[in-house]
Amino acid sequence: MADYNLVGVIKVMPTDPDVNLDELEEKLKAVIPEKFGLAKVEREPIAFGLVALKFYVLGRDEEGYSYDEVADLFRQVENVESAEVETVSRI
């Protein structure tokens, strides 16, 4: 694993509760640029059966690493209603 020193949490909301979260998670993992790492993915129940995916994305505190870039890529995936960077922290 590369020497990452940041973790960004990106919360992804699916378009509706009937979206297959396993398939959506795999599609989202596939669009993360290679320079980033992935620590884990959590599922967060929201309401009325809707579940958000929280991606813990690893990066570096240097030019070329933008969590907004990753969120923008997530928003382009089918069945994604929204993707927002919640936090970025040093590790």
UniProtKB/Swiss-Prot annotation:
The keyword Protein biosynthesis applies. Transmembrane segments: none annotated. HAMAP family: EF1_beta (MF_00043). Keywords: Elongation factor, Protein biosynthesis. NCBIfam families: aEF-1_beta, PRK00435.1. One of its GO terms (molecular function) is translation elongation factor activity. This is Elongation factor 1-beta. Belongs to the EF-1-beta/EF-1-delta family. It comes from Thermococcus onnurineus (strain NA1). Promotes the exchange of GDP for GTP in EF-1-alpha/GDP, thus allowing the regeneration of EF-1-alpha/GTP that could then be used to form the ternary complex EF-1-alpha/GTP/AAtRNA. Pfam families: EF1_GNE.
